[in-house]
UniProtKB/Swiss-Prot annotation:
Described function: Plays a role in pre-mRNA splicing. Binds to the polypyrimidine tract of introns. May promote the binding of U2 snRNP to pre-mRNA.
InterPro entries to which the protein is assigned, alphabetical: Nucleotide-bd_a/b_plait_sf (IPR012677), PTBP1-like_RRM2 (IPR021790), PTBPH3_RRM1 (IPR034795), PTBPH3_RRM2 (IPR034796), PTBPH3_RRM3 (IPR034797), RBD_domain_sf (IPR035979), RRM_dom (IPR000504)
Keyword hit for Acyltransferase: no
Molecular function (Gene Ontology), one example: mRNA binding
Protein name listed in UniProt: Polypyrimidine tract-binding protein homolog 3
GO terms for cellular component: cytoplasm; nucleus; P-body
Stretches assigned to the RRM domain: 6-80, 98-187, 245-319, 355-429
Pfam families: RRM_1, RRM_5, RRM_8
Gene Ontology BP annotations: mRNA processing; regulation of RNA splicing; regulation of translation; RNA splicing
Compartment annotation: Nucleus
Predominant place of localization: nucleus
Cystine bridges: none
């Protein structure tokens, strides 16, 4: 164990955790004199008034797991005995004002274009240039104002705010760049001082230092490009090299499952070609995905998922495809396949089943009560929220556990609510 210190090192500090959250966690143990947020590392350094206060805090948290906003954080003594101004400058993020802002967008449930960002940031001054890109930190943008004061005003007003209700949270820093270079005017980069730039982009970012890819989402067809949709790399355990398109699903609840319910679940990870329930093994099914990468996503995210009281086994099949026939259901031309247009943005939302489902294409006059009544037969609804984005009604519904949410999704996706055929997917939000 590190030597006792009045400086506490806190890890796993997510972007949703604020300075006030940390202060509230440690204030019962004494006076806090300094706090440095290390946003790039998801860490923080917190200095108590004396060593005994820090010791009391760490002794308490040895037996009690500290949690902030549903996230476990981990505490230990820092190697620093005291936080100095120099150390804060080294560890803290760059705060020297500049007319260029670096914006990271967290909880990005919906695609963000330069037009959306321009609408958000232009009220604070003339935006000269704007570039978006993917990095390991997530979806980011560089926004260049005409004058520094406008950038400072935008940062003060927008830091921590959401572009859309409940998601797309802005984390804003001053960039150390002096000038943005923009080569193309399209939905990923824009030079508002030069409207005559071409729109075509040749698979490179507008500036090689900005991001790993500038390829348009509809063009993403290879593993490296798809990786960008996940924030710069594929999820742990995903190789992107699988070429087997068919998966074998076993331990199904034969009394509750059918082809359409399997389609509703597996179509979250790719386009479905065919599904076949094995009549001689009623708790088994074959699902043929659009390609090997989509099949790999399905195996990765659904293996071990609970559905209708059964824990699913999902593995690659020895069969390369499902032969068309009366005993298989064909979905190749279904308009309910989710990856036909803007496919890559859908990869970004792939995840294991969660407690939260997202409903879209809802009727404009839908109420929270109507949404809850539509799905509550599948489990205990903890919370419901109806909101509007781009003039269209959507909703989030939180269940007590992942199995209930999965049952609601497989049973109610593509059903009618108020005359509208609704779409349902898992949301990665933790709470509403």
């Amino acid at each position: 164990m590190a030597e006792s210190s009045k400086v506490v090192h806190v890890r796993n500090v997510g972007h949703e955790i604020s300075e006030n959250d940390l202060l509230q966690l440690f204030q019962p143990f004494g006076v806090i004199t300094k706090l440095v947020m290390l946003r790039a590392k998801n860490q923080a350094l917190l200095q108590m008034q004396d060593v005994s206060s820090a010791v009391s805090a760490l002794q308490f948290f040895t037996n009690v797991q500290p949690t902030i906003r549903g996230r476990n954080v981990y505490v230990q003594f820092s190697s620093h005995q005291e936080l100095t101004t120099i150390e804060q400058n080294i560890h803290g993020r760059e705060d020297e004002p500049n007319r260029i802002l670096l914006v990271t967008i967290h909880h990005m449930l919906y695609p963000i274009t330069v037009d959306v960002l321009h609408q958000v940031f232009s009220p604070y001054g003339f935006v000269e240039k704007l570039v978006t890109f993917q990095k390991s930190a997530g979806f980011q943008a560089l926004i260049q104002y005409q004058v520094q004061q406008c950038a400072a005003s935008a940062r003060t007003a927008l830091q921590g705010r959401n572009i859309y209700d409940g998601c797309c949270q802005l984390d804003i820093q001053f960039s150390n760049l002096e000038e943005l270079q923009v080569n193309y005017n399209n939905d990923r980069s824009r030079d508002y001082t030069n409207p005559n730039l071409p729109a075509e982009q040749k698979g490179r970012s507008s500036h090689p230092c900005y991001g790993d890819t500038g390829v348009a989402y509809p063009q993403m067809a290879n593993t490296s490009a798809i990786a960008a949709a996940f924030g710069g790399g594929l999820p742990p355990g995903i190789t992107g090299t699988n070429d087997r398109c068919t998966v074998l699903v076993s331990n199904l609840n034969a009394d509750s499952i059918d082809e359409d319910k399997l389609f509703n679940l597996f179509s979250l990870y790719g386009n479905i070609v065919r599904i076949k329930l094995l009549r001689n093994k009623p708790d088994h099914a074959l699902v043929q995905m659009g390609d090997g990468f989509q099949a790999e996503l399905a195996v990765h995210f659904l293996k071990g998922a609970m559905l209708f009281g059964k824990r699913l086994e999902v593995n690659f099949s020895k069969h390369p495809n499902i032969t068309p026939g009366t005993d298989s259901h064909d979905y190749v031309n279904s308009n309910l396949n989710r990856f036909n247009r803007n496919a890559a943005k859908n990869y970004r939302y792939c995840c294991s089943p969660t407690k939260m489902i997202h409903l879209s294409t809802l009727p404009q006059d839908v109420t929270e009560e109507e949404v809850m009544n539509h799905v509550q037969e599948h489990g205990a609804v903890v919370n419901t929220k109806v909101f509007e984005m781009n003039g269209k009604k959507q909703a989030l519904v939180q269940f007590e556990n992942e199995e209930e949410a999965a049952e609601a999704l497989v049973c109610k996706h593509a059903t009618s609510l108020g005359g509208s055929i609704i779409r349902i997917s898992f949301s990665q939000l933790q709470t509403i």
